[in-house]
Amino acid sequence: MTQEVPRRLEPSPFEWKGDAGPSVKTLRPHAIPSVAIDLASVTKSYGDKPVVDGLSFTVAAGECFGLLGPNGAGKSTITRMILGMTTPATGVITVLGVPVPSRARLARMGIGVVPQFDNLDSEFTVRENLLVFGRYFRMSTREIEAVIPSLLEFARLENKVDARVSDLSGGMKRRLTLARALINDPQLLILDEPTTGLDPHARHLIWERLRSLLARGKTILLTTHIMEEAERLCDRLCVLEAGRKIAEGRPHVLIDEKIGCQVIEIYGGNPHELSALVSPHARHVEVSGETVFCYALDPEQVRVQLDGCAGVRFLQRPPNLEDVFLRLTGRELKD
C-alpha cells in the first residue's frame, strides 16, 4: 500500500506557484557545465547601503568553493542571488549553465540546499520529511521511496527511518538535512554553516560525508565561520569584507602568501611590553586582549627572549587559515 505523503505546515522556498509543472527529471539542466557558478561584476544594495560591490568569481564543477567573511560581509545575500531569491542590481549570474534569476526555477532543480538552521518538520518522522521534500521537486512517492534507503545509509540514519525528528540529536538532524538536500540528486550543493553548533564527533562525520560527495563529482558552495572546516574541505575560497572580494585562492596558497612563517601565541605579562620584546625577531606582531600573536621570522630567537620572562607562557604552531582570515579582516568584533 502506498504511503500517503503528510501535509507540510510551512511553505518551502522550492514550492511552486500555480499548476503542478514538470517533474525534476524534465525540468533540471540536462548537461553538466564545466563551470557550476559564475558571478560577473555583481552588485546589490539595500537602500543606500551596498552589500555586494562588484563581485566576480567562478566555481568549477566538482570543486568545493568557500565563501568566508565576517558578519555583514554579504555571504547570505550572495547565496540568495545564486538561488534566484534576490535580484542583483547589476551584473550577470549563471548557475549550472542557465541565467539567474530569469531561469532560477530551472537552476534550482539541480541544486540542494542545507540552510544554517534546521527547518525540518519536527512533528514528522524521518521518512515523512524526505517524502514531503521530494514532492517539491515533483517526484512521485514511488521515486522518493526508492531513494530513501540510500539517503539514510549515506546519513547513517538507517535505524531512525520511523523516528520523529524531535527525538533526534543535533548531529542527526544535520545529517538528515544533508540527506534531504540530496533527494533530487543535485549537481550543486549550497551549504550554509553546515556544522555550526555540533560537537567534534558530529562535525567530523559531516566532513567525511561531504568529502564523499566531492569524490562523486558533486559541486559544493560552502559558507562557514569555522576556519578548520574551510581549510579541510575547500579547493578554493574567497574572503569577503563589506561585499568586496579581498582575497581568493587555495587555502594552503593563501596561508603561504599571507602568513608564511611560524606563529607564536604569547600569554601572560604585559602584552605591549611583550610585543616590543619580540618585534625585532618578527615579521608582524598583533595584540588581541591579553594575547600577543607573533609571526616569527626567527622562532628560536623569540623563544630565547621569552624564556627569561617570568609567568609568560607561549605556544608555537604552524600558520592556519584563521590567521589569514584575521590578518585580512581584523580582530575586532563585527556585528
Curated annotation (Swiss-Prot):
GO cellular component annotations of the record: plasma membrane
Molecular function GO labels: ATP binding; ATP hydrolysis activity; transmembrane transporter activity
SUPFAM superfamilies: P-loop containing nucleoside triphosphate hydrolases (SSF52540)
Keyword list, A-Z: ATP-binding, Cell inner membrane, Cell membrane, Membrane, Nodulation, Nucleotide-binding, Plasmid, Translocase, Transport
Places the protein is found: Cell inner membrane
Biased composition annotated in UniProt, kind: Basic and acidic residues: 1-10
UniProt EC number: 7.6.2.-
Chief localization: membrane
Pfam families to which the protein is assigned, alphabetical: ABC_tran
Region (Disordered): 1-22
Primary role: Part of the ABC transporter complex NodIJ involved in the export of the nodulation factors (Nod factors), the bacterial signal molecules that induce symbiosis and subsequent nodulation induction. Nod factors are LCO (lipo-chitin oligosaccharide), a modified beta-1,4-linked N-acetylglucosamine oligosaccharide. This subunit is responsible for energy coupling to the transport system.
Quaternary context: The complex is composed of two ATP-binding proteins (NodI) and two transmembrane proteins (NodJ).
Family: Belongs to the ABC transporter superfamily. Lipooligosaccharide exporter (TC 3.A.1.102) family.
Protein name: Nod factor export ATP-binding protein I
Organism: Rhizobium meliloti (Ensifer meliloti)
